[in-house]
Design a protein with these regions (language model features):
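Cysteine-centered catalytic environments shared across enzyme families
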Residues: 1-261
Length: 261
């Protein structure tokens, strides 16, 4: 569990006290990442990232926010379980670390916004594309990792937890409609939260900021294919095989792994 934070002026104007604000956001999410803290601010002062790290893979060189050769930056929470396979596919010569964080940067280099379709894992990240002056954010298919954001006076704030956004909201108000939904369904619908000005990036969605506009769109949805051509025994064996494969992927780590029973 790591903590991500980001600030971007939609017009890429200089954000007052950018570095200090990122520090505040990191401090409010310190419990999410006891192993390290990092921050990056663009020279223009119009965009910056923060990060609190819980070290799992590549303890020595996986610090964030992370930069690639093209000047792109990423802040990321989660784990890309198929990162070893993606490293091979993308070309090991492009990598300078063993971190799955760098896989996100190199996948974006090759596939752009379609990179999320290649990831097998749980993730929430924000990536700054220097050449296109674009912010690209994504959340995993099932929303295992959290991602919240708000826009105040033309400035976008994003974080792993709502508490890191509250200092920047001038007037914190309860969204009564979302509150009714929560009491009914135990969740808020359509990306709403219990706070009027704060939104949740839905599972399987990306958020893109370019030319001052924010676009949110779905990149994945669950679908079912009916199959009447195989026996129950076939499906039992297939499910077992898929579960064993999934567990093997989930156990990849550079530190000891535990599980609740």
């Amino acid at each position: 569990m790591c903590g991500i934070a980001g600030i971007m002026d939609l017009s890429l104007e200089r954000v007052p006290l950018l570095a200090r604000s990122l520090g505040v956001m990191n401090s409010l999410q310190q419990h999410r990442g006891p192993d390290g803290e990092g921050a990056w601010a663009h020279p223009s002062g119009g965009v910056g990232f923060g990060h609190r790290r819980l070290s799992i893979i590549d303890l020595a060189t996986g610090q964030q926010p992370m930069r690639d050769q093209a000047g792109n930056w990423v802040t990321y929470n989660g784990e890309i379980y198929n990162y070893l396979e993606l490293r091979e596919e993308l070309g090991l010569e492009f990598f300078t670390t063993r971190s799955d964080t760098e896989v996100i940067l190199q996948a974006y280099r090759k596939w752009g916004h379609d990179s999320v379709n290649h990831f097998r894992g749980m993730f929430a990240f924000a990536l700054w594309d220097e050449a296109r002056q674009t912010l690209f954010c994504a959340r995993d298919r099932f929303g295992i990792k959290p991602f919240y954001y708000t826009v105040v006076d033309g400035v976008l704030y994003l974080a792993s937890e709502i508490k890191a956004l509250l200092p920047f909201v001038p007037e914190v108000e309860t969204d009564l409609e979302a509150f009714k939904e929560y009491l009914t369904f135990q969740l808020c619908l359509a990306g709403k939260t219990l706070f009027k000005e704060i939104r949740e990036l839905l599972p399987g969605h990306v958020l893109i900021v370019r030319n001052g506009d924010i676009e949110v769109r779905r990149y994945w949805e669950v679908y079912y294919t009916l199959d009447f051509n195989h026996t129950n025994k076939y499906f039992e064996e297939m499910i077992r095989s898929l579960l064993e494969e999934s567990v093997a992927f989930h156990l990849r780590s550079d530190v000891p792994v535990g599980a609740y029973v």
